[in-house]
């Protein structure tokens, strides 16, 4: 069998360290493998994200100029969308069109690990971002989105919690 080219790799070979946190915050987020960038893509961002129990992928946010798509590979995360939780299962996909102001993050409120495939456009210089629940952090961002479309937020605070009594997978 021929030697595999550099653009064929397993996500485990490309995963970064478990140290993803926002500046000034100690909360660990998901553990990512930037597949697109490390495999040579220049216009498309593709990330494999592992979400350990009690973690979230990011602060809730919306983007002005970049589409984003999240596909559940494994586990049952909650999609936090505009302050409301939506339980997902493997095979579910969620799309966030740019410019809509739909704020989102993904929470692992279960005792099992979650794996996600996150696809979007590579960082665009014109993109602006909004963090509706992290306004102090937003003030530090030179790319803050000042005229984000107004959307009603539900009551959920965007923080994960692990369901202690949730059923566990015996395998």
Where do the PLM segments sit?
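A short, N-terminal "cap"/entry segment at the start of jelly-roll beta-barrel domains
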Residues: 1-43, 130-131, 135-171
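Conserved short histidine dyad/triad with adjacent acidic residue
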Residues: 29-34, 47-63, 101
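Short connector loops at helix/strand junctions that flank enzyme active sites
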Residues: 41-46, 64-67, 72-74, 89, ...
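Short, conserved beta-strand element in jelly-roll/cupin
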Residues: 48-52, 62-80, 119-121
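Short beta-strand segments
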Residues: 58, 86, 127-129
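Short hydrophobic/aromatic patches on the structural cores and recognition surfaces of FHA
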Residues: 75, 91, 106
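Short acidic-glycine-tyrosine-enriched beta hairpin
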Residues: 83-98
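Ligand-binding loop in jelly-roll beta-barrel domains
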Residues: 98-126
């Amino acid at each position: 069998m021929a030697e595999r080219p550099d653009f064929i790799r397993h996500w485990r070979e490309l995963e970064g360290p478990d140290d993803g946190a926002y500046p000034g915050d100690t909360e660990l987020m998901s553990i990512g493998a930037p597949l697109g960038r490390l495999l040579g893509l220049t216009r498309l961002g593709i990330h494999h994200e592992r979400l350990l129990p009690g973690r979230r992928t990011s602060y809730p946010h919306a983007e002005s100029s970049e589409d984003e798509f999240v596909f559940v590979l494994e586990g049952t995360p909650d999609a936090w969308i505009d302050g409301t939780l939506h339980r997902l299962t493997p095979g579910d996909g969620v799309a966030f069109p740019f410019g809509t102001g739909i704020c989102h993050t993904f929470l692992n409120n279960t005792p099992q690990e979650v794996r996600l495939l996150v696809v979007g456009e590579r960082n665009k210089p014109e993109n602006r971002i909004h963090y509706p629940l992290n306004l102090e952090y937003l003030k530090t961002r030179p790319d803050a989105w000042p005229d984000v479309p107004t959307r009603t937020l539900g009551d959920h605070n965007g923080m994960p919690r692990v369901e202690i009594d949730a059923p566990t997978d015996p395998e």
